[in-house]
Amino acid sequence: MLPSRRPVRTIAQLVAFALFVSGCASPDVQEAAAAPPSSPAASAADWSVYGGNTDHTHFTTLSQITPANVKTLKVAWTFDTQAAFKGSEMQANPVVIDGIMYATTPTLHVFALDAATGKQLWIFDPNNGQPPSSRFRHRGVVVTGDRVIFNYRYKLFALNRKTGTPIPGFGGDSGWVDLREGLGRPAKEISVSASTPGVVFEDLLIIGSTVPEQLPSAPGDIRAYELATGKLRWSFHTIPHPGEPGYETWPPDAWKIAGGANAWAGVTVDPKRAMLFAATGSASYDFYGANRTGDNLYANSVIALDARTGKHVWHYQVLRHDLWDRDLPAAPMLVTVTRDGKPVDAVAQITKTGHVWLFEREKGAPMFPVEERRMPTVALDGEQPASSQRFPTLPLPFARQQLTRDELTQRTPEAHAAALKTFEEYNPTHPYEAPNVSKGTIIFPGVDGGGEWGGPAFDPGTGLLYVNSNEMAWLLKLVPRNDKSLYAATCAGCHGDNRQGGAGGPSLVDIGQRRTADQVMTMIKEGSGRMPAFGAAMDASAMKEITEYLMTGKVTSTAAVQKSPYFLKYRTAFFDIFLDHEGYPGIKPPWGTLNAIDLNTGKTAWSIPFGEYPKLAAQGITNTGTDSYGGAIVTQNGLLLIAATTYDNKFRAFDKATGKLLWETVLPAAGNATPSTYMVNGKQYIVIACGGGKNGAPSGGTYVAFALP
């Protein structure tokens, strides 16, 4: 693991930075107590918020870089965070205001750069010099008034924008707020973070959360904090409490023990209407819901709230009682479309299943007809799948909807034979069949979409929405839970029966060489990344038993866990992408696409394969598409700019009207992030985080900025 860069502050740097942000408050307690401005002064030259603007459309009016000259783009500067490690990722969409860029490293250090040169101005280490305990995924920061707000694990920090130091008075003297507090569960026994930055409305920061997909898990409350003090102003319970609408769609005690239904992909604010829009994920555990019978409002829903109070305005549940990890993967996008010759403000929402939902903004009515389709209800004992699901009739899906034998790979006879063997073993009968024990389940589109967290881009001038799509099937097998050891009952669902990994989590066979017993026990208690905190589910002796097994591979006792409220009869035995014998997708290309959809009509304007596998391309097998993570930006003057592809490390520019490739370059690592564009001193730049690390691809830690010569 390479060490992360430590702060380097020369006098010249600090003087230059002070000139850039003159007028920002000093980090003393008295000034921290004053309410900061609700948002930075927006300018066409800036990329002032995550997603580019408050509508989250990834749209810019900057026009120096054009379809005619984009092919002449050159690297303007690079910034190596020196923080990449095996498996690390860097998904930040940088914020740029007044010539300063703010973003994060793979180890979640926050930094500020001169956006014209890439020169570091300050850097903040939230972990006090300690190495990271696990991989982190983080998509950016909020810059507002005198402060930079970002999340590290359960800590929500407010940093002084000028110096990068925590602001006393935000959450007390520490300069951070504990996101585990205020959820109705013991704070030290749950795991809560926020991979996507929140939004600013007036004097509030409104934010979703990332919680474990296994049990125990925290509830996914949407919360608003005072920008000045970090005080919690309001919460919206996505798992309703007694007396709240939607409570009847869960078991009676679900509000005490259920988790998930969280807006991990971010939230969007309409400041003129004082409305907050959120898109939520599934309830935990993802694949077996006997503990959460019912439709599970407000999981898998688009929710509109009063941004000042958190009061419910409207909601629409896209998927009832999710059993396939089909979270809504991106923040809602605010768009204006044409209906009967008149402009109508709307909310667009992409899904992992490859659908685009379009809702009238104030009341939430779908703007295209919706079909209610009957679903199979055969399931494991205790499970009660929803008997029907909703589907928009338009736009048509941007991903294939069902896997058949005709869709299996024909890359080579051997690849087809391997894929056919797997297909016949799983024998899928319906894209919404409940996960089972007897044969397993093929989830298609897969758990990474369809659409993913990069989200779409939207051109308000044409009404076209642009979205990259993954075309990967995933394999899932459940098995009865084994109570022979606490490890088998608690951990094997992700890490395999013998610590070998392969069921959605990494191998732990060598964890004793990487961590001390105390570190492992702390991780079990407090959680780490997507792993839940087990402090609420077991006592110290139970955690010690699991630690001993992880360190030695030997079962030291046979304590049972069936009495736990988090105990389920079934767990994950296998969970991975459907691949052939050589590690390529087991289905026919395209394995990833880039799509343009007209939201005025619901029709697809164009769709092209997106991405390549370099080894296959060298054999003449080109234009296959690959999975992609990160989104596009669209320019008023005709460009669609996107990196995102996992294996070819390319950054591309397309003609937004036709999908024609205009320019491409190879990055130091995959740009699994959304780029930002901005202007400093009369020059337009485009910057992308090159973090890699997805699905076994090499990791990186470099930001690369491009400009015209």
Regions found by a protein language model. Give the residues of each.
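Bacterial N-terminal signal peptides that target proteins for export
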Residues: 2-14, 532
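C-terminal motif of bacterial Sec signal peptides marking the signal peptidase cleavage site
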Residues: 21-23
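Bacterial signal peptide processing site
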Residues: 25-28
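Mature N-terminal segment immediately following signal peptide/propeptide cleavage
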Residues: 37-86, 94-96, 119, 595
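Repeat-blade elements of multi-bladed beta-propeller folds
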Residues: 47-51, 87-109, 133-156, 190-216, ...
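Periplasmic c-type cytochrome electron-transfer domains
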Residues: 53, 399, 406-420, 424, ...
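Extracytoplasmic/lumenal domain signature
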Residues: 68-82, 110-131, 156-189, 221-257, ...
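Extracytoplasmic electron-transfer domains, predominantly the class I c-type cytochrome c fold
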Residues: 193, 485-558, 689-690
